[in-house]
């Protein structure tokens, strides 16, 4: 959650955390799904992709390389929707560079 907060990405739902029927109805409002642990949410993400056309990212954001790859995937997904809905694009490379500068 901290990574998404750092990137100013609003979280729609975290499932199964707080998984009420009302919360589950909100799932299709997300621009994409992040599946940080394939063992837990991959089947749900595949279902949402099939039923609602929602893309998903299934990179586990652990370690410098995978965190950077995950952020770049999120940037790509956001930049597909953001210019249409918010009339702007995001660039997370400065964040990646700042986080990995001394590694």
From Swiss-Prot:
Cofactor names: [4Fe-4S] cluster
Main location: plastid
UniProt-listed Enzyme Commission number(s): 1.3.7.7
Record GO biological process: light-independent chlorophyll biosynthetic process; photosynthesis
Keyword Nucleotide-binding: yes
Pathway: Porphyrin-containing compound metabolism; chlorophyll biosynthesis (light-independent)
Known catalytic reactions: chlorophyllide a + oxidized 2[4Fe-4S]-[ferredoxin] + 2 ADP + 2 phosphate = protochlorophyllide a + reduced 2[4Fe-4S]-[ferredoxin] + 2 ATP + 2 H2O
Compartments, record wording: Plastid, Chloroplast
Cofactor stoichiometry and binding remark: Binds 1 [4Fe-4S] cluster per heterodimer. The cluster is bound at the heterodimer interface by residues from both subunits.
Pfam families, sorted: Oxidored_nitro (PF00148)
Chloroplast among keywords: yes
Record-level Gene Ontology MF annotations: 4 iron, 4 sulfur cluster binding; ATP binding; metal ion binding; oxidoreductase activity
CC per GO annotation: chloroplast
PANTHER family according to UniProt: LIGHT-INDEPENDENT PROTOCHLOROPHYLLIDE REDUCTASE SUBUNIT B (PTHR33712:SF7)
Quaternary structure annotation from Swiss-Prot or TrEMBL: Protochlorophyllide reductase is composed of three subunits; ChlL, ChlN and ChlB. Forms a heterotetramer of two ChlB and two ChlN subunits.
Function: Component of the dark-operative protochlorophyllide reductase (DPOR) that uses Mg-ATP and reduced ferredoxin to reduce ring D of protochlorophyllide (Pchlide) to form chlorophyllide a (Chlide). This reaction is light-independent. The NB-protein (ChlN-ChlB) is the catalytic component of the complex.
Protein name: Light-independent protochlorophyllide reductase subunit B
Upper classification of the organism: Eukaryota, Viridiplantae, Streptophyta, Embryophyta, Marchantiophyta
């Amino acid at each position: 959650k901290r990574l998404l907060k750092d990137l100013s990405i609003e979280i729609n739902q975290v499932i199964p955390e707080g998984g009420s029927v009302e919360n589950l109805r909100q799932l299709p409002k997300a621009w994409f799904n992040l599946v940080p642990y394939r063992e837990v949410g991959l089947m749900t993400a595949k279902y949402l992709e099939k039923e609602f056309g929602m893309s998903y990212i299934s990179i586990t954001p652990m370690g410098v390389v995978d965190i950077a790859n995950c952020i770049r995937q999120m940037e790509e997904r956001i930049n597909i929707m953001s210019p249409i809905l918010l009339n702007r694009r995001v660039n997370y490379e400065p964040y990646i560079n700042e986080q990995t500068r001394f590694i």
